[in-house]
Swiss-Prot record:
Belongs to the UPF0178 family. This is UPF0178 protein BAV3236. PANTHER family: UPF0178 PROTEIN YAII. Coiled coil: none annotated. It comes from Bordetella avium (strain 197N). It comes from the Bacteria.
Length: 154
């Protein structure tokens, strides 16, 4: 397993949780962004800076993620792409994307985009909360524990 992070919009507190998880579980972690990122000194953790542009970081992750990897993203089309490859996808609020729910999420996203394009103020996401941080940490820990248990089976 490799953890890929769509890091441009990922909250710093989530990155910190991921840094600790990579060390604890000894799993490689790559943050992908169109800007320089600070990472702790670790052979497991690296940052990739991609050129600025629409969905360039997403395209990098979609190209490099493979079945069994974990992708952290709030971008629903990216989540759909990596799920189609057999990877896992989790958003920074702790919601796991699944093949069963991704079509509905894409449809809702497209509808909201159409409303915004027609001038309707749809508001934005709620502020990132302590409950979101906790939900992410719990979901991440459960996913990594499950992965470790599967890897240790003969």
């Amino acid at each position: 397993m490799h953890i890929w992070v769509d890091a441009d919009a990922c909250p710093a507190v989530i990155k910190d949780i991921l840094f600790r998880a990579a060390q604890r579980w000894q799993i490689p972690l790559t943050l992908v962004a169109n800007q320089m990122l600070r990472t702790p000194p670790s052979a497991l953790i690296r940052a990739v800076q991609v050129p600025r542009g629409f969905d360039v970081a997403d395209a990098h992750i979609a190209t490099h993620a493979v079945a069994g990897d974990l992708v952290i993203t709030a971008d629903i089309p990216l989540a759909a792409d990596v799920l189609a490859k057999g990877a896992l996808a989790l958003n920074p609020r702790g919601e796991r994307y699944s093949p069963d729910t991704i079509r509905e999420r894409l449809s809702l996203r497209d509808m909201m985009e159409e409303l915004r394009a027609s001038g309707v103020d749809t508001g934005g996401p709620a502020a990132f909360s302590q409950a979101d941080r906790k939900a992410f940490a719990n979901q991440l820990d459960a996913l990594l524990a499950r992965q470790a248990a599967q890897a240790s089976r003969p």
